[in-house]
Amino acid sequence: MFIKRCSRSIFLQVVIGLVIGVLCGVGIPDLAVQMKPLGDGFIKLIKMLIALIVFCVVVNGISGAGDLKKVGRIGLKSVIYFEILTTIALVLGLVVAYSLGLGSGANIHLNELPAGDIALYTGRTQEIHGPVAFLMGLIPTSVFSAFAENDILQVLLFSVLFGSALNLVGEQASGVARLINEFSHIVFRIMGMIVRLAPLGVFGAVAFTTARYGVDSLSHLGALVLVFYATCLVFVMAVLGSVLRLSGVRMLPFLRYFREELLIVMGTASSDAVLPQVMRKLEHMGIRSSTVGLVIPTGYSFNLDGFSIYLTLAVVFIAHVTGTPLAMTDLLTILLVSLVTSKGAHGIPGSALVILAATLTAVPAIPVAGLVLVLSVDWFMGIGRALTNLIGNCVATVTIARWENDIDLPRAQAILDGRLEAPTRTGGEPLERGVVAGEGKLQG
């Protein structure tokens, strides 16, 4: 009975993969470190299709949306929402770290820190884009380069323009619209095949990480990790929970609905690995595809709530550990600098540590050499960052859809309460373009 249930449930398969990965990492570390390609390969397979999925979803949504003014309104509301929520996250991290005196009393001297370990990150702070360079970076050199480099913001810009053009041309372009809609079914079917490999990918990632880092790396920096996770939990349940409640949705059923995706993120420390499945599930809840297609890809670059908490928390922690006194002006400087640098993460490998280095560099009072203190626990904190970022973007989509009346709320509540069946497997077919999902089987 259990084996039959496992064969049908991706969630249970991922749990088993995670547990076996931990056991392998602890019991057979030499073998476990060789499992890294399994996790890396799974994420690469997912990323292979992300640009195509964003293109299909956005074009299908906008071409069938009718009013293009609505598309612009959704974009503007999304940017305003992202800025407000990430600012709250930055302030929360700052207040928690400062009020708890996180790191105080460690008395670590700068000459004790191995500065060479941070050169990899401090040397790349110039990759953080300024406002003008960032905006220019949204425009691809060519359409093909945007897809070839997997630059999601550039793909999103082209997709919005392409979908808008289809919308304006109207009936004459109906054949192209149908072709893209049919093509999206093929892409999502491929994604469904790839997602079946999630248990293997999670096993490889967890086995390698457990063997490589173990639990010893948490011993000296446990307070930082625990406070970070506690702060993320408060943000998710109190802040995001309140926002979601205003939209008529409860947080716990909402999290249960995305449990498979959250577990995959927990195993891979990457929210990219579940972007396509999340978009599909939000559409299945009854949210218009055009809204999902605009909010989720944009949020992956601009709405980084977990990263925002991490940034200010880590900066204040490093200041306290190195014995650097912080005046009110220093705290304001940290906040203002973080507001800018936290938006520069897009497209930078190892962006968390690079942007942390850039933030420390921009706040002269805090020694950038302190970055080395968080290196050993960055992967553990990366899980919390990815989970919080993902939940934040899902909540953002529901909230903005509610503002725009683009969500079938009774359907969403029925799915979350278990009265309407959720997708039986992750990564299946996309919903029809430009319509609010209305199909499903009510359970008696």
From Swiss-Prot:
PROSITE patterns xref list: NA_DICARBOXYL_SYMP_2
Compartments where located: Cell inner membrane
Record's GO cellular component terms: plasma membrane
Keywords: Cell inner membrane, Cell membrane, Membrane, Symport, Transmembrane, Transmembrane helix, Transport
One GO MF term attached to the UniProt entry: malate:proton symporter activity
Predominant location: membrane
Taxonomy, superkingdom: Bacteria
Signal peptide: none
Membrane topology field: Multi-pass membrane protein
Keyword Ribosomal protein part of the UniProt annotation: no
Pfam families: SDF
InterPro entries: C4_dicarb_transport, Na-dicarboxylate_symporter, Na-dicarboxylate_symporter_CS, Na:dicarbo_symporter_sf
Transmembrane domains' residue ranges: 9-29, 42-62, 78-98, 152-172, 190-210, 221-241, 307-327, 354-374, 380-400
A GO biological process held by the record: L-aspartate transmembrane transport
NCBIfam families assigned: PRK01663.1, PRK13027.1
Family per similarity comment: Belongs to the dicarboxylate/amino acid:cation symporter (DAACS) (TC 2.A.23) family.
Main function: Responsible for the transport of dicarboxylates such as succinate, fumarate, and malate from the periplasm across the membrane.
Protein name per Swiss-Prot or TrEMBL: C4-dicarboxylate transport protein 1
Organism encoding this protein: Pseudomonas paraeruginosa (strain DSM 24068 / PA7) (Pseudomonas aeruginosa (strain PA7))
Annotated gene: dctA1
